[in-house]
């Protein structure tokens, strides 16, 4: 048994909590390596154990999980008598399968130090034949059950519940509501003690508001409720007003280097940004991964879409190299694939990269993440701190890098600073040449040329990426009009730009300089290639129809330029009118608080835009002055960063 931390007078000593923690809990936290409580634990645990409703807002990686698990377990083990069969004493709700699984794993690690509760846990395969200690039915114990949609059916969950009669449920919202709807599951006021909603704002962001309200209606009002999150939004406040009784609000912040307590991320996390043209992004990522000392063992890279994960997971390994194992993870993966890939990353003993969407940005307690790289800044700025917070957890040093395009996107730095999430320039010298960028593009295209299916995947991913980019909440910073289409296409290793309405007036090279025999460009999958050839043959046999179609196309192309321009202007006006109507409808449906928030955001963005435009003009004037003094103009070559 691990030695308990020595008694002390520190307000964060585990043995100084009032009411006092059980001896076995002190053994458990000591074994887990926690010599003293984190600030959020020191604030929340005594309150929750003292029968207070709590709303806890704290930075990611601050130890929120134990802040609610310990009070819940202590409460269930201090009842006067065991709960009746099929009566539930406590529920923990999580927004995602992965987070629910992690909470359950921490819970079972904790209960392993309480022999009566440990005896109820499902034995591992290695211990199936080992004798298990039995305890009288009158012994108080915690019997947990994990409920996850996609892993088991509701009928199987109910069968397990009836067989084991758990008194603590850890679940995602939908599967929990299904179980609570059964007449065999009981949560009366005489039995039910505590409800925990972890990552509460994410629960609402994912559309679980109605489900949560249905769950709350099935639970007694006389209960203790804990709401834990990295940020508390107006929507969360609505849940607080409905579901909590006179809650105590706990807000734990960390000091920045200036000593001002306004940072929303861990002090041990170094948050940086890197400005690079599209074609330089992937070579820059490779340079970061190979130049850091010590080399990162676990890296998370965020992109904006699921199809982006699917495509980039196929081309990035050839660019980054074999020293890093790249593992994809997104919300559209089958449940078993998500679980398998997540465990591969967590349990990897070699350098690994998790290429993922925002499914991994919240709540997941992935141990020992060294670096977070945001290839795409998140559409919702609130998500930024949650992505960064995957590194630098529990006091561990971490590095976060967000990649930005030169120009207007650099205003994102000021935008983040206003939101109390400051980022600094990437501190290490990094030089990427155009030759490096061209080599990365060539490497990616080589992979795409090997299989037409990868080309199809890339076209879909690029369109999906653009749609996500166009919906960015800070649209005055992330402007579609400023995008370098050819640079983006080359960076992604595309063989041509996809057909999409936004490129209708594009005057550049849609082929991206690639000369390809498309008729003989084949799929690796033989059956798919066979079907493609049959379609090509069918088109050839219907050549007359094709000629007629081509004639119609030529006819449309021969329309007078002025008429085409007039048609385009009419379409543009119709589109603008439609967008204006949609904006008006959206505005009318907003509450007064939501309208005020939108106005404040727009005002803030305009102030940032004006400020940065003034600074940009001053820098340009100074640069022109230096250039003239030197007797020539600077070339456009990318020279890296200091």
UniProtKB/Swiss-Prot annotation:
The keyword RNA-binding applies. One of its GO terms (biological process) is assembly of large subunit precursor of preribosome. Its EC number is 3.6.4.13. Keywords: ATP-binding, Coiled coil, Helicase, Hydrolase, Nucleotide-binding, Nucleus, Ribosome biogenesis, RNA-binding, rRNA processing. InterPro entries: CTT_SPB4, DEAD/DEAH_box_helicase_dom, Helicase_ATP-bd, Helicase_C-like, P-loop_NTPase, RNA-helicase_DEAD-box_CS, RNA_helicase_DEAD_Q_motif, SPB4-like_CTE. This is ATP-dependent rRNA helicase spb4. GO terms for cellular component: 90S preribosome; nucleolus; nucleoplasm; preribosome, large subunit precursor. The lineage of its organism: Eukaryota, Fungi, Dikarya, Ascomycota, Pezizomycotina. Residues 45-250 form the Helicase ATP-binding domain. ATP binds at residues 58-65. A motif (DEAD box) lies at residues 198-201. Component of pre-60S ribosomal complexes. It catalyses: ATP + H2O = ADP + phosphate + H(+). Residues 527-642 are annotated as: Disordered. It comes from the Eukaryota. Residues 527-536, 577-628 have a biased composition (Basic and acidic residues). The gene is spb4. ATP-binding RNA helicase involved in the biogenesis of 60S ribosomal subunits. Binds 90S pre-ribosomal particles and dissociates from pre-60S ribosomal particles after processing of 27SB pre-rRNA. Required for the normal formation of 18S rRNA through the processing of pre-rRNAs at sites A0, A1 and A2, and the normal formation of 25S and 5.8S rRNAs through the processing of pre-rRNAs at sites C1 and C2. The Q motif is unique to and characteristic of the DEAD box family of RNA helicases and controls ATP binding and hydrolysis. It is found in: Nucleus, Nucleolus. One of its GO terms (molecular function) is ATP binding. Belongs to the DEAD box helicase family. DDX55/SPB4 subfamily. A motif (Q motif) lies at residues 14-42.
């Amino acid at each position: 048994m691990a030695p308990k931390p020595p008694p002390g007078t520190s307000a964060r000593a585990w043995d100084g909590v009032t009411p006092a923690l059980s001896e076995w809990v002190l053994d458990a936290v000591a074994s887990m390596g926690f010599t003293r409580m984190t600030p959020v634990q020191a604030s929340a645990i005594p309150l929750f154990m003292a029968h207070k409703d709590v709303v806890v807002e704290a930075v990611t990686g601050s130890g929120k999980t134990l802040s609610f698990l310990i009070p819940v377990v202590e409460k269930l083990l201090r009842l006067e008598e065991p709960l009746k069969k099929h009566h539930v004493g406590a529920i923990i709700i999580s927004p995602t399968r992965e987070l629910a699984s992690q909470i359950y794993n921490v819970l079972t690690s904790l209960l392993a130090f309480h022999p009566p509760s440990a005896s109820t846990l499902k034995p591992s395969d290695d211990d199936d034949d080992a004798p298990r200690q039995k305890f009288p039915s009158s012994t108080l114990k915690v019997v947990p059950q994990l409920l996850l949609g996609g892993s088991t059916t509701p009928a199987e969950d109910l069968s397990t519940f009836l067989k084991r009669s758990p008194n603590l449920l850890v679940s995602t919202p939908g599967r929990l509501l299904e179980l609570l709807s059964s007449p065999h599951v009981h949560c009366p006021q005489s039995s039910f003690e505590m409800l925990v909603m972890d990552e509460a704002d994410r629960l609402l962001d994912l559309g679980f508001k109605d489900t949560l309200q249905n769950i709350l209606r099935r639970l007694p009002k006389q209960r203790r409720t804990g709401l834990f999150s990295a940020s508390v939004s107006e929507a969360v406040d609505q849940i607080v007003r409905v579901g909590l009784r006179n809650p105590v609000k706990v807000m734990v912040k960390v000091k920045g280097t200036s000593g001002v307590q306004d940072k929303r991320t861990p002090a041990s996390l170094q948050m940086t940004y890197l400005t690079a043209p599209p074609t330089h992004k992937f070579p820059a990522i490779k340079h970061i991964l190979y130049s850091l000392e010590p080399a990162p063992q676990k890296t998370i890279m965020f992109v904006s879409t699921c199809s982006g994960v699917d495509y980039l997971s196929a081309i990035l390994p050839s660019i980054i190299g074999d020293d890093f194992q790249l593992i994809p993870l997104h919300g559209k993966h089958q449940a078993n694939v998500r679980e398998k890939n997540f465990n591969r990353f967590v349990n990897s003993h070699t350098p690994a990269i998790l290429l993922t969407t925002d499914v991994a940005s919240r709540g997941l307690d992935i141990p020992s993440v060294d670096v977070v790289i945001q290839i795409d800044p998140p559409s919702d700025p609130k998500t930024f701190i949650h992505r960064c917070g995957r590194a630098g957890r529990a006091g561990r040093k971490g590095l976060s890098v967000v990649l930005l395009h030169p120009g207007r996107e650099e205003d994102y730095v000021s935008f983040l600073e206003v939101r109390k999430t400051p980022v600094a320039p990437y501190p290490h010298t990094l030089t990427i040449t155009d030759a490096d960028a061209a080599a990365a593009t060539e490497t990616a295209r080589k992979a795409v040329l090997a299989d037409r299916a990868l080309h199809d995947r890339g076209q879909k991913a690029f369109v999906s990426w653009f749609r996500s980019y166009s919906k960015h909440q800070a649209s005055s910073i992330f402007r579609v009009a400023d995008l370098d289409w050819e640079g983006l296409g080359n960076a992604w290793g595309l063989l041509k730009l996809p057909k999409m309405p936004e490129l209708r007036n594009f005057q550049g090279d849609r082929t991206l300089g690639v000369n390809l025999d498309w008729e003989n460009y084949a799929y690796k999958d033989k059956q798919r290639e066979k079907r493609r050839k049959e379609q090509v043959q069918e088109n050839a046999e219907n050549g007359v129809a094709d000629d007629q179609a081509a004639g119609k196309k030529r006819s449309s192309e021969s329309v007078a330029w002025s008429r085409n321009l007039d048609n385009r202007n009419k379409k543009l006006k119709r589109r603008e009118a439609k967008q204006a109507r949609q904006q008006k409808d959206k505005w009318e449906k907003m509450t007064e608080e939501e309208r005020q928030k939108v106005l404040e955001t727009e005002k803030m963005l305009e102030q940032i835009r004006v400020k940065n435009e003034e600074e940009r003009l001053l820098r340009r004037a100074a640069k022109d002055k230096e250039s003239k003094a030197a007797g020539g103009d600077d070339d456009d070559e990318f020279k890296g960063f200091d």
